[in-house]
Amino acid sequence: MNAPAKTIALTTLAAVSLAASAQQQVVKPPQAQAWIDVATFSGMGMPGMGGPGGGNPMASLGGLFGGGGASGKVSFLMTQTGSTGRYVDVTLLSRRNPQLAEATQDVPAGLLSPALKLVAPRDVPQAPRDDDDVVPERDPQRPQGKLFLYWGCGETVRAGQPKVIDFASASAAEIAQAFQSRRATQRGAHSANGRPHWPNPTDGRALADGASLVGGHAFSGNGVPEGFRFNIPAAQDLMPPMQLRQADQGGAIALSWNTQPSARAFFVAGMGARGRNEMVLWSSSEVPDAGMGLLDYQTNAAVDRWLRERVLLTPTTTSCVVPKGVFVGEGAMLRAIAYGHELNLVHPPRPSDPKVAWEPEWAVKVR
C-alpha cells in the first residue's frame, strides 16, 4: 500500500522539478551599464537647534528638499555630501572594455549641453562585483550613556514612549534593535578603475539653477554599444526647492512644506542630546525606526512597502509636528528626505519566452 503512494509522490516532484528547470531563463549582464544619481540639498534648521540639517546623505530618487544652484566647479559624489546645491553624478561601465578611460554623454539643452565628458579615475579601489548591487551598511560603534527613541507626528508624546536604552547595561542585541532602521539602498554612481564618471577634474561644471535632465541622453565611447540612447521623463528630474516652514506650537515644533509633484514619499528624522551622554532620536514614522538607513536612496518597491507600513509620509502630506518635550536639551539636528521615482531602463526588453536568453546591450539606473 505504501509503495505506490511513494512512487506517485516521487513522480510528481520530478515533474515539478523538470517544469521549473525548463522555465528558467538565461539572463546575461548588459554590455554597458550607467548609473545616474540626482540630488538637491539645502540647509535646514529648527528653533533651538544648532546648525543646519543635512550632515548625512539625504539623497532622493529625484532630488531632495533643495536650495538653489551651485557656482563654479563641483566634485564627484556631491550627491552624497549634503552640501547645499543641485547635483548629478554619473558612472559608466563597459564590459567590452573593462579599462575604459573616458566616454561622452550627450545631454539635453537644459543640462550643460551638448555633452558631458566622463573620465575614469586613477589609483582607486577595484570595481565592485557585477552582481553586487547592495551597498553595505556600517556597524555602529557602541555609544555611551542612554538613548531615548521617539516616533510619530503629533503635538504630544504618545503612550509607551520614549523607548529607553541604557548602553551600560543593554546587551548587544538590544543595542542593535534600538538602532535598527529599514534600508534598501542599492549601488549607484561610484568611483572605480575603468569606469569613467562625471563630474571630474577635466569637466566639473556646476549645474545652473534651471538645469533639467528631461529629454534625450546618449553614451558613447570605446566599447560602449552603439544606440545607447534613452529619454529621462519629468518624474526623474531635479526636484524644486522645498519651502520648509516651522513654528512653535505650545512647545511642539510644527513643520510644514510646499507640495512636491514628483515626490513618492517623505520622511523626517531628528537627532539631539540631553545633558551628557544622552542621545535623542525621533522620526516621523508611525512605527519605531531609528531612521538612519532611510535617509538615502531607496528602491521604488521599498518605498511603496514602507508607505503601506506607515513608516513614510504619503506624497500628499505637507506637515508634521515634532511632539513637545522631544528636543529640550543642548541642541539637535533635523534631516528630511523626499523620495522621487527611480527609473530602470534595459535594452532590449526581457523576452517573454523563457526559452529565449536575455542578453541586454545596455542598462541605466536613474535615481
Question: What label would you give each PLM region?
Answer:
Residues 1-9:
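Bacterial N-terminal signal peptides that target proteins for export
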Residues 17-21:
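N-terminal signal peptide c-region/cleavage motif recognized by signal peptidases
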